[in-house]
């Protein structure tokens, strides 16, 4: 099986799931799969592999958390014991997922059920789709090319003047395969080093963090703030409601706010002095990262907060050269973190699949994001999107 542990996912799934257990245990949601570059040159069809994908999901749904895995989670300062107890009896249920081959040669994946019981599907299902696709289309993968490309990245990061630059692995969902993912991480650990003096800050993957002694990284994803559109008191206040609910859960811990659910301008309107002080920083995931960083720093200054005490996290389609450019622009002006995904874990010379699974409904109503990159928006209800734009004053 591709997925052999329920920890083989991103940390933010657990940090969000804990909020769901404590604050929104009754929420019902629906997620939908999309391949953003389907039909593009070099991208094959997924429909031929639909039975294999279903088989792997069946295997995923037979997994339980092991005692050592639960102990690892329990040792994290922000994970509460009642949540670990819940995970001790948890398993994913296949009835909440359907995978269908479409006449176009694409596939439809729908995940629908209680948020608490469906939140852990997204990352392993994406990793399954990716690995099934690549093991069928690249039966003899060019690992030599992959290693060469990784070596180039490492040498770029070790150039003069970049000693303080740290990167993190955010590549679970779109990795070429699990074995390759582990090799990449082991190589980075050996070559870049970890801890205070190393250049590898950690990984979003909880299983590999546990296995390799790395720091697991992550706070919140778009789905959390999107669900708040249906769970909060008023749509206009849903972003504030999301941040306040997060703060109620974590009391200042895990303080990185995601900034692009309604675009940067709406984020800055809501992210007032209170949130500037309370949260440790913000994460960039769409739009121009240089412009975003400058606006973020100016916003801190305007709210009488020293930007040097705050962290800017960049995680949008990063490559090593782009990471270095951003580091050079913002070094010394704030704390910095860089999460590199596909470019680390799926760069062997083959065209990667740009696949996502996004929440589209919560408690029966549409939810959406209006990110700073229009192609990243995903909602089936045009009327709702128009309403959202109006409410958040987006042009």
From Swiss-Prot:
GO terms for biological process: NAD biosynthetic process via the salvage pathway. Its EC number is 6.3.4.21. This is Nicotinate phosphoribosyltransferase. The keyword Ligase applies. Keywords: Ligase, Phosphoprotein, Pyridine nucleotide biosynthesis. Signal peptide: none annotated. GO terms for molecular function: nicotinate phosphoribosyltransferase activity. The keyword Phosphoprotein applies. One of its GO terms (cellular component) is cytosol. Gene3D superfamilies: nicotinate phosphoribosyltransferase. Belongs to the NAPRTase family. The modification Phosphohistidine is found at residue 222. InterPro entries: N/Namide_PRibTrfase, NAPRTase_N, Nic_PRibTrfase, Nic_PRibTrfase-Fam, Nicotinate_pribotase-like_C. Pathway: Cofactor biosynthesis; NAD(+) biosynthesis; nicotinate D-ribonucleotide from nicotinate: step 1/1. Catalyzes the synthesis of beta-nicotinate D-ribonucleotide from nicotinate and 5-phospho-D-ribose 1-phosphate at the expense of ATP. It comes from Polaromonas sp. (strain JS666 / ATCC BAA-500). It catalyses: nicotinate + 5-phospho-alpha-D-ribose 1-diphosphate + ATP + H2O = nicotinate beta-D-ribonucleotide + ADP + phosphate + diphosphate. The lineage of its organism: Bacteria, Pseudomonadati, Pseudomonadota, Betaproteobacteria, Burkholderiales. It holds the Pfam family NAPRTase. It comes from the Bacteria. Transiently phosphorylated on a His residue during the reaction cycle. Phosphorylation strongly increases the affinity for substrates and increases the rate of nicotinate D-ribonucleotide production. Dephosphorylation regenerates the low-affinity form of the enzyme, leading to product release.
